[in-house]
């Protein structure tokens, strides 16, 4: 990213990424703000999706360490075992896990969707690669839907002159 942005744009983008990771801001907030600040919609979508995938990768690959945390580890082991028993009695439900994790990551919430999706996928007993693929698919789909929608709304607001003059000077003079 540093190679494709000026130093001030890079610092702004880094700030938006940090804000995305920390609640209460989510992708539904950060992507429109980035677009309003002049970043292309596709750049914002890819940047935020990258954060989801990176946090999902970290959590998925290191989730086994959570089983070793005192007090929390035994609770996670118990929850995972109950989930596995439930899956054995309802085998048809296991086929929906991929799409459930994808939807879980795609729908905006507090913080990174990759973090939540990785934990949910591993607690459901999914292997690492399907969890990562579901996170990737959900992050890209959700971020691109929000980015395209935000760019379309900003375009319509600018074309129709529905923004106040101060905000219009910032948002409408940028490339959408």
What is the predicted function of each stretch?
Residues 26, 123, 172-173:
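Generic detector of bulky aromatic hydrophobic side chains
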Residues 21-33, 108-119:
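Transmembrane helix boundary and interhelical junction motifs in multipass membrane proteins
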Residues 106-111, 140-144:
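Mid-bilayer segments of alpha-helical transmembrane spans in multi-pass integral membrane proteins
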Residues 1-16, 37-107, 128-130, 136, ...:
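Membrane-interfacial helix-loop-helix
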Residues 110-137:
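Hydrophobic alpha-helical transmembrane segments and immediately flanking/interface helices
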